[in-house]
Amino acid sequence: MKKFLATLLTLCMVLGACSALAEVTYPVETSTTLTIWKQLDGSIADGGYTTSMDTPGFKAWCEKSGIQVELKEFADATSLVLSLNGATTLPDMFMFNAGRDYNGGVAGLIADEMVQVIEPAMLEQYAPDYWAYINKPIYMNEITQLDGKMYYLAGHIFEEKSPYRYWRGLFYRQDILDAIGRDVPQTIDEFYDTLVAMKEHGVETPFVFQGKTDLRDCLKNGELTSAFGLVNTAEYQADGQWHFGAYEPEYKDVLAFMKKLYDEGLISVDYLSMEEATSRAMFCTGEAGVMYGNNSRLNTYLSSLEEGGSMVGGHVIHAADQDHAMFSYADPMTTSDDITFISADCKNVELCMELYNYLYTEEGNMIRNYGIEGESYTIGENGKPQYTDLVLHNPDGHSMDGVARSYALINWPGIHANDQLAMRHPEDSQIVAYERWSNTDHDEHVVIHTAVLDEYLDEYTDLWTDINLYIDECRAKFISGEMSIENDFDAYIDTLKSMGMDRVCEIKQITLDAHNAALAE
């Protein structure tokens, strides 16, 4: 244990001058209870829990920090946002992906006066461990807004050069590939031929998506689009120019390919309504042979596989004349999930920072990543944590990932330690998946700051709300055949123009230029 903690301490001292900062003594002496709103982490259900307040990890955080929390969890981000907008008094803190789920993103929250500025001087005094870790360009470039200020505490933070940022992609039933005599496909032709061969082998619906929005996300994340000369179907940059894939001419070929899969029964006609329980059952029983989804689910799926079944991570699909794909899913170094806002109504800012900071202390980091020593993990002979049988072979039949997330605080803010991620993804299929999913040009094309400049926010929001809905509707109609790709695609582009898509592009380009200029300073 001492060896491992010494390593953590060394890392902390390298990343920030810890000795120059204040030190918070835990447990904090206070009778104040903080209020936090957050979307429910559904993964804890696989660990036997229905609310985070009952999990060992959350209880340990409150106990060890000395700060009690009244936690309100929401089924989804929409419910959380509606409650925020309708609240007479906001909670002390709230955590969610504002860039994705709030109108106008972080800039919208600022404009609506929902949040407080996070002052560096306050962090130095009340969150010194967090500040020592985060105060580096690789992280600060992501969390600092154009005005040079911070308005939230970071969500999940990856260690530098972590392959675990790339945690979504294609995975295959290896036993089915073996049965049809095929390798894991890399090119779009190999991918299509593999799906056809699976269908001929008796696989009812070869390609499924983990959840009902994941066909959309598969394309937005560039999983298949490189083969058609398109980075992705969402926003990206190329040589400093902002693009939106679903407004590019190459999008027509992407849609034609997806319609071909739909027409030939290679994807489900119910993809828009299929829940994960259904897609999981299909994949695990051999009714499907390929899934687009999360790496962490592989652990859960392994226990449900039919006898003789096996899995392997796939490549991000590209064209025959490409060495690798242009894009893939990847989290930023500081992820957008569970970024933590201190609300405008909060009267206990110092205490909020102290609670948050605890997750960056040596003790708090261990709880956040591994849980309770002696229960969910022990320190091995190599000085590193290792899961106990409670996690690896849970006596109540709960999944490894579900128990790990319940005893630790993995889906809460903090450092995603590489050792923890390796422990939770130990299967060869998962290791291979991370290697393959990270072999793309993602970081060349990703738009780090997606929120538009304040002066354009209202105009952009008015335009984008309807445009985004129209793009989603047309995608589904093109794939199903309700709209003709050959006859209606040009009209689709023209409609986007009439709705103001060119103006959206102008606003986003102005924003991208401003962010790139700020980063260059």
Task: Cite the ranges covered by each PLM segment.
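N-terminal hydrophobic targeting signals that begin at the initiator methionine
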Residues: 1-2
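Extracytoplasmic/secretory soluble proteins
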Residues: 5, 9, 21-521
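Hydrophobic core
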Residues: 9, 13-17
